[in-house]
Amino acid sequence: MPFGTEAAMERDKNQLISVPVKEQPQLPYLAAINPTGQKTLMEKLGILSDAAKYDVSCSSSGVGRKGDGTGIGNTVAGGICHSFGADGRCISLLKILFTNECIYDCKYCINRRSNDVPRASFTPDEICELTIQFYRRNYIEGLFLSSGILHNPDYTMELIYEAVYKLRTLYRFQGYIHVKAIPGANPLLVQRLGMLADRMSVNLELPTAEGLSRLAPNKHRKNILTPMRQIQRGITQNKEEIAVYRHASSFVPAGQSTQMIVGATPESDYQIMMVAENLYRKFELKRVYYSAFVSVNADKELPALPGGPPLLREHRLYQADWLLRFYGFEADELLSEQKPNFNVLLDPKADWALRHLELFPVEINRADYRMILRVPGIGVKSAQRIVRARKNGALAFEDLKKIGVTLKRALYFITCSGKMMYPTKIEEDYITRNLISNKEKLPFGADGMTYKQLSLFDDDMPGWQKIAGGTL
């Protein structure tokens, strides 16, 4: 039987939930979560949208889910962002936790069990109503749903599954849905959610198992990697089934992602990039997110951050990650055990080029695509345009500027028809000084944050304020 058939989903669902979800309008746990006299829906929304802001592992996915005309919603392959502004601007993704209750006591987490913070939990029906009502008002295009662990992983995943199942079936919502898989939950629940969600993610939390055991003693690396492997195999199997069964249901069509906290444990950039590279290779992840550690708890195991969160380090990791995914670099080309951390003054690509000046200057009219990609100041689109344009004749520096090459960075590393743009010394110190003088524009806001989830409620937020680092 195909992996993604409705019959398989119904069979697996009934093994865990004896009564079909659509026949369960009232369940015992709903009263336990929200008895009469507890928080209103708007109070819950305020608490649980704010609690979700530390999870950065969501943004646009590139997936398209075309509505079939029988329901509501349509996923456009792009433009899915973090949240929306109080002025009605579509930032487009309702990003909330199902609950910030949690049985775990992770030292770095604001929602840890021992913290005295306002607690709240949605019901599946409340999640559905919020999503639909926000969608109808054109505030969002989709839903990002994560959660603390309520009672146990299976219990939490069943609640999440019920919410997503109702959205897709009862409410006929066909927009984008990104769901967090809970480590340690029953694999059948992961499989069933994968048939309904566009993207799933399992947070790695910390780069190494040692760091995880020290700061999150209730979590285990194996429990995190198991659902990641299951999702990867499910995606591969689903692609094979769709090739044979044209109408087979899709399984996590936008792929999976993960997130690592940077700076909470002493791992080097080299260790972090090696972990990321292995995740891309072994688990075929679409994206690894890096979150600069923000100190929200007082704990002796957590590092002191007199300079604030390591935002520049996070930025360099994202730049290096881009080089791994789109520029053909490998982690051990960028860093090594002898040079374990990125240069804070130079981006990783320029730093690599300066350490390999024997390969430069590159002759633009003859170099292969791979080498052109490695020139600082030349991006993927510019490299593709160069390869196409030079078929029609030799390119000059004026042509490169029109193509989109950043010449103030590239001029030290390229020639056109054997000539450099200006007489330039191919010396590391000289080029470094000139590159540093061209101050790099870092994606930090006025408050030093690399990203910002807009409030659902603050009416005094300037309309021009933008989210930094919000594209995928």
Regions found by a protein language model. Give the residues of each.
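Flexible, acidic/Gly-rich N-terminal and inter-domain linker regions that tether
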Residues: M1-E101, T406, I414, Y422-L472
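Conserved, mostly hydrophobic/aromatic
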Residues: L93, C106, L145, V202, ...
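Short, charged beta->alpha transition segments
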Residues: L94-I96, D125-R136, A243-V244
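Canonical Radical SAM [4Fe-4S] cluster-binding loop centered on the CxxxCxxC motif
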Residues: I96-D125
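Conserved AdoMet/S-adenosylmethionine-binding subsite of the radical SAM
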Residues: C128, H151-L334
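Short Fe-S-cluster ligation motifs
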Residues: I132-S147, A320
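Long, highly charged, low-complexity intrinsically disordered interaction regions
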Residues: E301-L373, R409-M461
